Amino acid sequence: MAKLTRRSFVGIMAASTTALSMPSLAFGALPRVVVIGGGAGGATAAKYIAKDSKGAIDVTLVEASKRYYTCFFSNLYLGDFRNYGSIGHNYYGLAVNHGVNMVHEWASSVNSAEKKVYLGSGATVSYDKLVISPGIDLKFDSVNGYSPEAQSIMPHAWKSGTQVQ
């Protein structure tokens, strides 16, 4: 029988504590990473976590929209170098080519103590690690006199979509 030293005991305790802090690992499941936001940052993070882990990490991307239009390619559309449809991307490739689980719902809140993402439907998604990449949006009440109705008069064009078309 191998001699149990203080150093090996501390190592065993540290490893077991780490496993307990990641619930999916404690029960033999794959570690779970949830990414909130399917824009350029979130989709790229989900893709490379899944790709680089070679299936060793269960990756879920939470994004309400089923299609993402790249703001940074909108100039190609506006300059008549590309059509509008060509700057839009769905999430099919992430799911099929990289094994990313897609959840097309709004992430309404996060409980970091329970390691859960609450969805607009009331469902939850558990995680071991969380990436939050919601992208850009506008809080209309933060700009005096600006409202959702005013954006048709003075477009902000922060999000690619109808204001770009």
Where in this protein do the model-derived segments appear?
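Glycine-rich, N-terminal phosphate-binding loop of Rossmann-like dinucleotide-binding domains
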Residues: M13, P134-G135
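A short, basic/flexible loop-to-alpha-helix module at the beginning of a structural domain
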Residues: A15-A29
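Beta1-alpha1 glycine-rich phosphate/pyrophosphate-binding loop at the start
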Residues: F27-N101, E149
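A conserved short coil-to-beta-strand element within the FAD-binding core of flavoproteins
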Residues: E105-E114
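Redox-cofactor binding/interface segments in oxidoreductases and associated redox assembly factors
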Residues: L119, I132-S133
